[in-house]
Amino acid sequence: MIKQRIIYNGSYFSRKPNGISVVSRELAKSINPNLITLLAPFSDNQCNFHKIPENLSPDNGLYSHARRLFWNQFHLGNYLKKESDSILFSPLPEAPIFRGIKSVVLVHDLLPLRIPYLTPLLPYHIFYVPIVLKNASKIICNSLATANEVHEKLNISHKKIEVIKLGFNRGTLRPLKRVKENFFLIIARHTPHKNIPRILKAFYNLRRFNKSMKDLRLKIVGQYDKRYTPSYKKLCSNLGIDNCCDWIYWVSEKEKLELLNSCQALIIASLWEGFGLPALEAMACGTLVVASNRGALPEVLDCNGILIDPDNISSIESGMKRALDNKLLSEKLRKTGPLIAKKFCWNNTAKQIEEIISEI
C-alpha cells in the first residue's frame, strides 16, 4: 500500500504525442488517480491536477527543453520540498538533482551515450541524466536491454533497477479488415539513430532490381527536423525515388490505425531502440514488422517478425523482400501479433509502478 502521495511529472506532455510523450500521458491516465497529483500543462481529465506552463512541452521547440530543465530544478524542486511526505514519479529521466528528494524515474534508453551525434542536448545526456539516475530512489527501465545499458554504462546496481513492460492504446490500435496496399511504413523521428538513409537506399535497391516492385511506395511518418530532414529528402531525389516516398510529419491515432493496417510491413531499422513502441503497435494491428536485431526490438517481437542488421543495406533490402514474398508469415502474424501485443497493457504497467513505489 502506498503511504505517500505520488507527484507526477507531466512536463513532457504533448498535444501531438509520440514516443516518450505518449508514455507520459498514458501512464498518467492509468495510475490510480487517488494516488497522484499531476503537474502538467494540461489534463486528460485527471482529478488532482496542478497546471504548469505550456511552454515546457516538446511542442514548443528546442528551447522548451531548457525551460523544462529549469522548471524541474527550481519550481518542481520547491514544490516537492513543500510536499515532504510525497515521492516524485517522472516518466523520463528528469528530476531536481539536489539530494533529499525521493524519486522514481523511468528510463527509455541511453542512446546518446551509445551513439553520440552532434546535438545541443548532448551535455544533457552526458552530465544531467546520469546524476538524475544516481540520485533516484528507484530506476524503472522499459526493457532488459535498457536495464543492462544503465547498469553497464553508469555502473548502477541491478538492485536499484526494475524492468517493466510498456503498453499500447488498445482502444484505437487493433486489426481492421483491410486489403494490404503496396507500401512500406516507417514511424520514426528524423534523427541519425533511426537509420533512415540506409532504409531509403535499401528501398531504392529493392525497386531497382525487382521490376515487379516499381509501384512500391514508402511512407515516412515523423516530425520534420530541420537538421536532418532536408538531407534525407535530397537523398531521395538523388536516388530518383522522391516520387514514390511520402513524407508525413504527423498523423492522428485514427490515421495511424489505417496506415498500420494497410501497409505491407512496418520497417524499424534503428541502430538502437530502448523499447520500440511502433513495433508493438504494428503487432497489435496484426502487421508484419521488419526490425533491427539491436536493443529491445528482439524482446518486443519475441521471434515474431523479420530481424535485419541495421548496418547492412543488403540485409535491410532482404528483409523488405521477405516481407513481400512470405505471405504465410504475414498471415500468421495477422493472428499471432494481436495475441502477443495483449501482454503489453498500460493498466498492468501502472500497477507495477504503484507496487514499486509502495516498497520505497
Features from the language model and the residues they span:
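Carbohydrate transferase catalytic cores enriched for Leloir-type hexosyltransferases
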Residues: 1-360
